Amino acid sequence: NWYYFYTYYCRPTMMTAKQVSGFEIVKLWDADRSLAEMASKVFYGRPVVCDRLEDVSDDVDLVFISDCNGDGSDHLELSTPGLKKGVATFIDKPFAYTLKDAYKMLRLADKHGAPLMSLSMMRTAPTVVQFRNRLAETGGCNFGSIYGGGTPLAGLYHSIALTQATFGTGIESVQAMAG
C-alpha cells in the first residue's frame, strides 16, 4: 500500500514508502529546533540537526525545502544559502510567493550552476500514475472531479497538480467551489 503521508501516524518511525538506495538524509534544520530534532528521531537520529540555516547546505548533494509556512513566502530565504553554494535544490510547492522571489531564485541558481526544481508530490504519486494509466485504458473521460486540500495556497496547488497529473494539461475548463 502507498500512503499520501510516508509514516503511519501511530508508528511514526515506520516508513511506508520504498527507500531509494544511495540516498540518505544527513542534515536537518528548522526555525523551531525541537521540530528538527523530532524529525531526526523519525530517521533514528541519523540526520544531524543544524544550528543555522546556512549549515544545512554544507557538504550535501541536495537541499530539500519543505512546505514550511504554506505559502512559499519563505522559500527565497530558505533556498539562498544552498543556491549560492551551487547545491542542487528542490523546493516543495509553491515555488515562490511572488514572481519577484521566483526570478531571484532562478537567477541565483543560474549564477551558481545549481539545479533547481519545484513540484507537488501529487504529480508523481504512484497511485495517481497508476490511476492515470488505467484511465487511458478506458478511452478517457469527459468529466472529472477532484476534491482538493482546501483554499490555502498549498492545498490549491496540490489540487491543480493532481488534476493535471490525472487528466493531462489539456484541461479546457475548471470550476472551483468552496464552503
Stretches found by the model and what they are:
Residues 1-42, 122, 136:
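N-terminal Rossmann-like dinucleotide-binding module
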Residues 23-25, 60, 141, 171:
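Core-facing hydrophobic residues within beta-strands of well-ordered domains
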Residues 24, 48-49, 115, 173:
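Conserved beta-strand segments of alpha/beta enzyme cores
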Residues 32, 42-106:
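Beta-loop-alpha module in the N-terminal Rossmann-like domain of NAD(P)-dependent dehydrogenases
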Residues 51, 91, 120, 175-178:
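Short loop/edge segments at beta-strand edges and connector loops
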Residues 90, 95-156:
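A contiguous active-site-proximal alpha/beta segment in oxidoreductase catalytic domains
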